[in-house]
Regions:
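Secondary-structure transition/capping motifs at alpha-helix termini
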Residues: 129, 150-151, 284-288, 306-313, ...
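Extended, hydrophobic alpha-helical segments in both membrane/secreted and soluble proteins
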Residues: 290, 297-301, 312, 353-374
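Short acidic loop-to-helix transition motifs that present clustered carboxylates
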Residues: 139, 297-298, 317-322
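Short, glycine/charge-rich flexible loops or terminal/linker lids adjacent to PRPP-binding catalytic cores
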Residues: 309-354, 365-368
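Conserved short alpha-helical segments that host acidic/polar catalytic motifs at enzyme active sites
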Residues: 1-223, 228-287, 293, 381
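Conserved small/polar residues in nucleotide/adenosyl-binding loops
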Residues: 390-394
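Short beta-strand-centered segment that lines the nucleotide-binding/catalytic pocket of NTP-utilizing
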Residues: 386
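Hydrophobic, well-ordered secondary-structure elements that form the walls
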Residues: 304, 360, 382
Length: 394
């Protein structure tokens, strides 16, 4: 893998009765906004009639009250927030994707990236498929619809398609009567589900989105598992479970996920605290203050402080209107955002030996700029500690 990528957030809701599933999906996507800020979309299913809207931009900007009203009520909905991994940031690559086929229709949203997308795309094009986007999500949707020609049900088509798609993926799929959740055999990307007090099933990339809509967490979806939600309840297809070792991306705990999420039974907040404590044990230093780089470095900084006994302070003020720097598309955009995203609190660092905790180094864009900011604010010494180092040629 030549560069590190964050791969979006997915959300789905299944209800036994028609209700405002669009608003529920909106709030779920809002809770997942940290996973991608390029584009977002929602598809609502009202008794087999699909209504969708998607565009570039943040959830709060794209889904105005008028747009939510236009989506209307339904009993199933899926949604997506995107950070591009394959395909450009154009509106055409926004998700979910809606596909009409000879046996009905389907909507699909995808978190991840395939390693055999190019091979599958060429195969499908030779068979006559016409692609309207450059994302591999459309490849997945065409593979499923192709399998649906001979499969007795949409879930069996998905089960057969899983044999063909290789890579990291968590999917939410909507048919006229079902919501389907799929996690790849390695469990590389997170996916979980829960239930609201009024009996609606919720699927999401992270448990924080369940909290946002008042759903009780039931469990994580297993690596390789397909979970089907319909009028008969919930059932699981585990034909692909246990075929590969678990391999959740470590960046989920270090950077991608919100600290209030629980992934595969482990609190993200606790994982970051432990990472900071480990840093203090492995790389101690004489210093006056510990600070963290907002937001994902804060928990680790607190862990470092507790383990080392060095006081923890808030060292930076973050401009909350600036998106996450690493997942901003384009190097120039990332550099510009760092300049206005963070400002050190001079009285905390001036004349002091500072331990600065960051979650990771990928491109080094943020780190170099932040060290310069601390020097300009008068820090006597700067001791940088990093939870995870990732070598990238990006």
């Amino acid at each position: 893998m030549s560069n590190l990528r964050e791969e979006c957030g997915v959300f789905g809701v299944f209800s036994g009765e028609t209700n405002d599933v669009a608003s529920t999906t909106y709030y779920g996507l809002f809770a997942l906004q940290h996973r991608g800020q390029e584009s977002c979309g929602i598809v609502v299913n009202d008794d087999g009639v699909f209504t969708d809207y998607k565009d570039t931009g943040l959830v709060n900007d794209v889904f105005t009250p008028n747009i939510i009203d236009r989506l209307g009520e339904g009993n199933i909905a899926i949604g997506h927030v995107r950070y591009g991994t394959t395909g450009s940031s154009e509106r055409s690559n926004a998700q979910p994707i809606v596909v009409n086929h000879i046996k009905g229709k389907m909507a699909l949203a995808h978190n991840g990236n395939l390693i055999n997308s190019g091979e599958l795309r060429r195969e499908l094009e030779l068979e006559g498929s016409i692609f309207h986007t450059t994302s591999d999500t459309e490849v997945i949707s065409y593979i499923i619809t192709k399998e649906r020609l001979s499969a007795p049900s949409i879930e069996q088509a998905v089960n057969h398609a899983v044999d063909r798609i290789k890579g990291a993926y968590s999917l939410v799929i909507m048919s006229p009567s079902k919501l389907i959740a799929v996690r790849d055999e390695n469990g590389f990307r997170p996916l979980c589900y829960g239930i609201t007090k009024d009996g609606r099933y919720i699927v999401a990339s992270e448990s924080c989105a369940l909290d946002a809509v008042g759903a009780e967490f039931i469990r994580d979806i297993k690596p390789g598992e397909i979970v089907v939600f319909d009028k008969n309840g919930v059932r699981s297809i585990e034909d692909h479970c246990g075929k590969a070792p678990g391999a959740l991306c470590v960046f989920e705990y270090i950077y991608f996920a919100r600290p209030d999420s629980v992934i595969d039974g482990c609190s993200v907040h606790s994982a970051r605290l432990r990472a900071g404590a480990f840093l203090a044990l492995e790389h101690p230093v004489q210093a006056d203050v510990v600070i963290g780089v907002p937001d994902s470095g804060l928990d680790a900084a607190l862990g470092y402080s507790k383990q080392s006994g060095i006081p923890y302070e808030i060292g930076f003020i973050k401009n909350k209107y600036i998106g996450r720097t690493f997942i901003a598309p384009g190097q120039k955009s990332r550099e510009d955002k760092v300049k206005i995203k963070l400002n050190p609190i001079a009285e905390v660092v001036k004349g002091k030996r500072v331990v600065m905790i960051d979650d990771s180094i990928v491109r080094g864009t943020t780190s170099a700029r932040i060290v310069k900011l601390l020097r300009e604010a008068g820090a006597k010494e700067i001791h940088m500690r990093v939870c995870l180092l990732y070598t990238s040629d990006a």
